[in-house]
Regions:
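The catalytic "switch" region of P-loop NTPases
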Residues: 4-14, 168-287, 293, 412
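Short, cationic-aromatic polyanion-contact patches
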Residues: 397-414
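P-loop NTPase nucleotide-binding core
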Residues: 13, 19, 49-53, 57-187, ...
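Winged-helix-like regulatory helical subdomains adjacent to P-loop NTPase cores
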Residues: 296, 300-374
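Alpha-helical DNA-recognition elements
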Residues: 83, 307, 386-390
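A short, basic N-terminal segment
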Residues: 1-63, 83
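P-loop NTPase catalytic cores that bind/hydrolyze ATP
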Residues: 107-115, 285-314
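Short amphipathic alpha-helical interaction segments
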Residues: 373-390, 395
């Protein structure tokens, strides 16, 4: 066995010494199988009930799920689709992350066509847009001549990819074909609208009003700044349900930690929150501290979990003691500092936040604005939003304004 083989075996053994097959934390729920997602998905009962109540109605609905980046919108959406796949086999559910530079009609057309691999017309639509298909798509032509007998020659050639010229019409045709096979309806879930420019999102939504009110159910996810500021005020009738996801409370976060660990535990699964074994390799005290620091933000929770378990494995320990937890926090803090160092303006604002404790339009001074090289507070809001998206700050609503406070990891340093 080579040295590299030895190191691989040692790495695997270090995780197993923690009682786990693998590190279960992941920032990308789309990589998870439905069975795994069902095991780790925690909380959101009220929100799930609101969504599933709509599915007891024959009328097609349009649902908007919105919230800050990293709040768990994708996991929530995928859990709904997983349940519907099991409970509504006669409903076709599709999922797609919004590609850049595509309108919603074309995006929905791609999602639906991919979900119908046996439909030749659907696959032809994909092929014409240059999207690979399972079946080889050819255009067949014929040449015929007549003498004493009929003579026919047939030839096939590739169809050249083209941009969808009438995606709305093509989508309607494909929906009709899909509804013949799925009488309970078609649900098209479009994720990640928050990864687009807010102005672009508003344009997309305005242009897509026709398809959103068409023959399919729609579920969309996005950021409040990109969607709700426009749609929930000027176009309130576009969605039947606008659902905001907030941070999880501490008891739910603690239960989520148990579910994550159980999904990768080698044996001795335990889901009793009062049993210390349920959070192994954490100790009850370190599990509670970990959940407190994660602030109920699912993506931040996963980032911290990855760092803490990786640190524990590298140290070769079997339990996450307060000292090991602190080492894990130090590891992710180093990564955060490196990330900030690459962003000059965000770094300067974060340093000011660390000094001030909080920052808002009402509290920032003229001297501080000059120090940052701007003339008004509105100029730094986009940077504060990006810091929020990367879990460096959090928003704290106050009476007259939104204040931003820094997210600081616990430190044992004096």
């Amino acid at each position: 066995m080579t040295t590299a083989d030895d190191i691989f075996e040692q790495s695997a053994n270090n995780i197993q010494n923690l009682g786990l097959r693998e590190i279960p934390f992941t920032e990308s729920p789309t990589d998870l199988q439905n069975k795994t997602l069902d095991r780790i998905f925690t909380g959101r009962e009220k929100e799930l009930r609101q969504v599933f109540n709509l599915f007891q109605n024959r009328e097609r609905r349009r649902i908007l799920i919105y919230g800050r980046i990293g709040i768990g919108k994708t996991a929530f959406l995928l859990e709904i689709l997983s349940v519907l796949t099991r409970k509504r086999p006669k409903m076709l559910t599709t999922y797609i992350s919004l590609p850049s530079e595509l309108d919603l009609a074309t995006t929905a057309l791609i999602a639906l066509a991919k979900a119908l691999p046996d439909d030749d017309w659907a696959q032809r639509q994909l092929h014409q847009m240059g999207i690979p298909t399972a079946k080889e798509i050819k255009e067949r032509t014929s040449e015929a001549g007549t003498n004493a007998v009929f003579v026919g020659k047939f030839s096939e050639k590739d169809i050249a990819p083209t941009k969808a010229q009438y995606p709305t019409v093509s989508l309607e045709i494909l929906l009709d074909r899909a509804l013949e096979k799925y009488p309970d309806g078609v649900l098209i879930a479009i994720d990640d609208l928050d990864k687009q420019n807010p102005r672009r999102v508003r344009e997309l939504m305005h242009d897509a009003q026709g398809i959103l009110k068409g023959k399919a159910w729609f579920m969309l996810t996005g950021h409040p700044l990109g969607i709700t500021g426009d749609l929930l005020t000027s176009e309130r009738g576009l969605f039947d349900l606008q659902l905001k996801l907030e941070e999880l409370d501490q008891p739910t976060t603690y239960k989520m930690l148990i579910n994550y660990l159980n999904s990768a535990r080698i044996n001795n699964n335990c889901d009793d929150v009062n049993d210390p074994r349920s959070v192994l390799p954490f100790l009850p005290e370190t599990a509670k501290e970990f959940c407190r620091v994660s602030l109920g933000k699912p993506r931040f929770f996963n980032r911290l979990g990855n760092a803490v378990l990786s640190t524990a494995a590298n140290l070769g320990v079997t339990h996450i003691t307060p000292e090991v937890l602190q080492q894990g926090f130090k590891t992710i803090e180093k990564d955060r500092k490196l990330l900030l160092a690459e962003k000059v303006m965000e770094n300067r604002i974060f340093q000011l936040l660390q000094k001030r404790g909080s920052l808002s339009d009402e509290t920032i001074t003229i001297e501080e604005l000059e120090l940052l090289g701007v003339k008004s507070y509105s100029e730094i809001v986009p940077y504060l939003e990006r810091l929020d998206d990367e879990d460096f700050v959090q928003r704290s609503p106050q009476l007259d304004a939104i204040a931003y406070t820094p997210i600081l990891l616990p430190s044992s340093d004096p």
